[in-house]
Amino acid sequence: TINLYAPLYISNYCPGGCAYCGFAADRHQLRKILTDEEFDAELATLKALGINDLLLLTGERTSECDFDFLSFHVKKASQHIPAVSVESFSMTTDEYTVLRKNGCIGVTLYQETYDRSVYEKMHRWGPKRDFIKRLETPEYALTAGMRFFGMGVLLGLSDPISDAISLFLHLQLLRKKYWQTEFSISFPRIRPEAGGFQPPFKIDDKFLARLIFAFRICMPDITLVLSTRESPSFRNKMAGLGINRMSVASKTTVGGYSSETSPSGGQFDIYDTRN
């Protein structure tokens, strides 16, 4: 069985300096947040596609997109979509608790890389530059009682084998402590974005497939996720073998579902454009 979800970007404002991200503050593209009417239109479009699992995304915390803005949209989305999760800025335990009470069932937060020197090089400025805070944030969400928690590294930033081992050990530690939570692992490869970032490490299909199978063998009960960053052919081959959760019909622009001509800049280029 493959569980399908859709990402919904509600803001692309960001003060951060992530070298690999199209939302970074030095990227020259239009910034936008969804109005109430636009958010309603996005939800209606996704519901018409049969989407029942939604992931709300933002950049780092800003005055335009602060905690109250995110919390409002979580609460509103949960009134229309059965499963609502977030992939956003780091928060406190109290803030994650508010999100849970407003209908959020899960949090996705990537460490990006476990190599601290590479992490600090890639996160040039902004709140996300704090390596230790990023590493500790999963426990804030888990302490708040989130039912689902997604982890991952951005493949290509650093030595992928070292990052995969560190991710595995981190996940093992969290699963022992928060055994009632359902965990997932994602395998995002770096995709082209507005800044033209080139990853230091090239990750081919063969290596990615081996990595997915390794996690499936070592953790047979874990949810493994593959997004539309990957090609249709690769996703087709991996569906049901190692992968049991996939994004579908994805848009990385703000307002991209209800408007095919959304002027806002996307976080990265998607590969699998099927609806």
Name each model-derived stretch.
Residues 153, 163, 167, 172-176, ...:
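Conserved mixed alpha/beta catalytic, RNA-binding, or beta-rich assembly cores of soluble enzyme
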Residues 18, 56, 109, 141, ...:
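Conserved, mostly hydrophobic/aromatic
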Residues 5-38:
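Canonical Radical SAM [4Fe-4S] cluster-binding loop centered on the CxxxCxxC motif
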Residues 25-39, 46-141, 147-151, 155-157, ...:
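Core AdoMet radical
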Residues 176-275:
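Auxiliary Fe-S-binding modules of radical SAM enzymes
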Residues 92-101, 147, 157-172, 231-241:
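Catalytic cores of alpha/beta
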